[in-house]
Structures are given as structure tokens and as C-alpha cells.
């Protein structure tokens, strides 16, 4: 929503490579000027659980704000914080998946971002020609408005962002894995083989949709060992080949690396 109206943005997300899952977090920076790094501190922390607060509260600037999920835990003694019943508000819209939209509405209030920016984005994002599009769009907008309203009642604010200026050139919002995949494709990649593991899974998905035709293809295997041995085999056969994995997956590949 921010980039569509001319703001610059940078996001960074962490998804642990664990079978049982683990703590995940996403960091976003938005500015009217180019954003060159993620930075060391944040203006706002949204903690969905106590672990998130305990882990990241020290990263919040002294004049920053902490929003905590009061449906999950209570926080006392930190005058930078206020509770937001994120899950309860999402349920009240009839869309239990709208918790993140509640948070977006809360953040929009803190920086005084016009609701129209958000509404326009939701309309574009969820208008897909399906029978339930109207209901989905309205529930998400309602969730944002509820988050904004509850946050306004808290009295917290960070001041309004400077008005965005649409650049003369076209801005592109691209994910890191997508940019990497585009680069590999442009470099002549012919064969991609991989096993789904975070955060490499999105590379595999992109390749399955885009590495097609002219003898090029992507292949999902059932283990990391198959992935590395298949990669080596393709290389020996003269193909420009590629795989991607994470720490645990790379450890499993060590057997194949010995070839």
C-alpha cells in the first residue's frame, strides 16, 4: 500500500528452518526517502506473544511504541506499550485470518496514514473475480478500521509520515528470493532442483512457475540428498543447474558434497 502511493519500503522476514516451527518475525521500514538498510532499532514493535516482546523490546527506540496482543498476554511496567485485542477484533469481522490487517490499521493510525491508501490496496489485492470477493474485501477493511480505532483510543501516536512523492521512474517492489530467481534465470539457468525448506521454498515455487520451456525445468525432490546429487548429475551432463536450501538442509547435503 505504501509503495503504491510513492513511499520507499524495505522489508525483512525470518522463518526458522524447524520441523515443528518456531518464532517468526517481519521488519518493515517505510520512508519518503530511499531506505538503504533495515537499521538497528525500530519505532514500533508489534508483539503477538510474550516471547516476541521479551526478544525484541530492547530494539524499540526510547520514544517508540509497543503494541502487544492482549488476547495472549498482559504487559505492565512499560509505559511505551498498550494492549490490542488482535484476535478478538479479527473474529468480530467474521474473518479470523484478518489479524494482520488489524495490526496494519493500528500502525496506520500511529503514522497518520490515510485509510484510503489501505482501502485501495486491499481492493486491488483481493479483487480476483470470485463470488466471495466483496465479503473478503469488506472484512479486511473492517479489520483495519477496528485496529485504527482502538489504537486512536490509546492516545499513542508517532506523528505523520511526510507526504510521498511519486518518482519519475517506475518503482518495483520485489522480494529478495524473487530477485535472486530472476537473476539466475537471466544468467541462463536451465535446471533447478530442490526440496521445500524455509526460507528457500519460495525460490522453488518461483522456478516451478517460470523455469519452463526450451529444455528448462524445475523439479521438487523428496530429500536434500536427492537435491544435491541431482544437481551434481545435471552439472556433469552440461546443464546450468541450481539448488537452494537452509542450514539443516545444507548439513544433509554434506554426503553429496563429498562426490
Language-model segments: residues:
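Active-site cofactor/cluster-binding pocket
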Residues: 1-187, 191
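Thiamine diphosphate
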Residues: 1-57, 198-259
Amino acid at each position: 500500500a505504501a509503495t503504491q502511493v510513492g513511499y520507499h519500503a524495505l522489508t525483512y522476514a525470518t522463518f526458522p528452518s524447524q520441523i515443528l516451527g518456531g518464532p517468526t518475525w517481519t521488519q518493515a521500514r517505510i520512508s519518503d526517502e530511499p531506505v538503504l538498510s533495515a537499521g538497528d532499532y525500530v519505532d514500533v514493535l508489534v508483539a503477538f506473544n510474550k516471547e516476541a516482546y521479551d526478544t525484541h523490546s530492547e530494539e524499540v527506540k526510547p520514544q517508540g511504541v509497543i503494541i502487544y496482543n492482549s488476547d495472549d498476554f498482559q504487559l505492565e511496567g512499560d509505559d511505551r506499550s498498550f494492549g490490542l485485542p488482535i484476535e478478538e477484533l479479527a473474529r468480530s469481522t467474521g474473518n479470523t485470518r484478518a489479524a494482520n490487517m488489524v495490526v496494519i490499521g493500528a500502525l496506520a493510525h500511529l503514522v497518520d496514514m490515510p485509510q484510503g491508501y489501505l482501502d485501495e490496496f486491499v481492493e486491488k489485492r483481493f479483487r480476483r473475480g470470485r463470488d466471495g470477493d466483496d465479503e473478503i474485501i469488506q472484512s479486511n477493511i473492517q479489520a483495519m478500521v477496528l485496529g485504527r480505532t482502538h489504537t486512536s483510543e490509546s492516545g499513542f501516536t508517532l506523528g505523520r509520515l511526510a507526504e510521498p512523492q511519486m518518482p519519475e521512474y517506475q518503482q518495483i517492489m520485489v522480494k529478495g528470493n524473487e530477485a535472486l530467481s530472476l537473476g539466475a534465470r537471466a544468467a541462463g539457468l536451465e535446471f533447478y532442483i530442490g526440496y521445500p525448506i524455509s526460507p528457500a521454498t519460495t525460490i522453488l515455487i518461483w522456478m516451478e512457475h517460470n523455469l519452463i520451456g526450451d529444455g528448462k525445468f524445475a523439479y521438487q525432490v523428496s530429500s536434500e540428498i536427492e537435491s544435491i546429487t541431482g544437481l551434481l548429475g545435471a552439472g556433469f551432463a552440461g546443464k546450468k543447474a541450481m539448488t537452494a536450501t537452509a542450514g539443516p538442509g545444507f548439513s544433509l547435503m554434506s554426503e553429496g558434497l563429498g562426490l
